[in-house]
Amino acid sequence: YKDSRDVQSTEFGRFIPGITMVNEITKIDDVVMVPWLVGNEWKKVGKMKCKYMFGHFELPNFFMNAMVEMPDTGELKGSDFVAQEYVFSGHFHKRQFKNNIHYLGNPFPHNYADVDDDERGMMILEHGKEPVYFNWGNCPKYRNVKLSTLLDKTKEIMKSKMHLRVTLDIDI
């Protein structure tokens, strides 16, 4: 499944009017859309000149979530993207930026792998302008907390849509 685009969850989209499925690397004017990379496609992506590149990249030294950094596999790296003004990628849950690369992140935290990572929401990009990020202030939040801290600061810690993993550090 990692070496093919034959089976994917978005395939149903081709039957919806107004949606175009991009299943091959596609350039339209100054925009390049890159589906899941297979084979040696990663070798040509960084050299493709464009203003905007959108992809589903697994770049080393970026965090997949709030705790786990993507290891270097010896393939595509952030430093390979020298011919693009902006590179936007999905795939990783954490919103983050390095140089011209923007990982958009998920619109909301999903589980305890996203502890303390509240910069979630959406991004709007108007062609020719800077991307604008919006945080969803009322998104679900995940926290790890000691019971003693929770008891001392209950009102500060417990908020709407707060998921708490409580560690027992005192006798109950």
List PLM regions with ranges:
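Extended recognition/assembly regions associated with phosphoester-bond processing machinery
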Residues: Y1-I172
